[in-house]
């Protein structure tokens, strides 16, 4: 059983487990299946909008498919949520990603 299959089995047991859904998105991206990674992290964003790690990765995956408009929107939303939850490290990373987009 692959890591992705294991994670999917865990998610089937607990569909509200944000970390497992996040890890599935990362596994798809690791396989360069950015469409599935985006779909999975968008589902996570719908289910648990305050799961801050989602935003940096999701924005990056949008960049991988050359969708800078969505990447920027995701980074900005994540930055607001990170600041709201006082996650200064995530806020810093999201701001850096936004700045990098602006430099392009």
Over which residues does each language-model region extend?
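Conserved structural position within tetratricopeptide repeats
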Residues: 9-12, 43-46, 80
């Amino acid at each position: 059983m692959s890591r992705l299959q294991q994670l999917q089995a865990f998610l089937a047991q607990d569909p509200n487990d944000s970390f497992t859904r996040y890890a599935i998105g990362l596994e798809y991206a690791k396989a360069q299946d950015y469409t599935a990674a985006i779909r999975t992290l968008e589902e996570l964003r719908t289910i648990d909008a305050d799961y801050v790690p989602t935003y940096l990765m999701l924005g990056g995956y949008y960049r991988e498919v050359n969708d800078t408009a969505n990447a920027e929107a995701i980074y900005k939303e994540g930055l607001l949520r990170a600041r709201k939850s006082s996650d200064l490290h995530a806020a810093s990373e999201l701001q850096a990603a936004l700045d990098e987009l602006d430099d392009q």
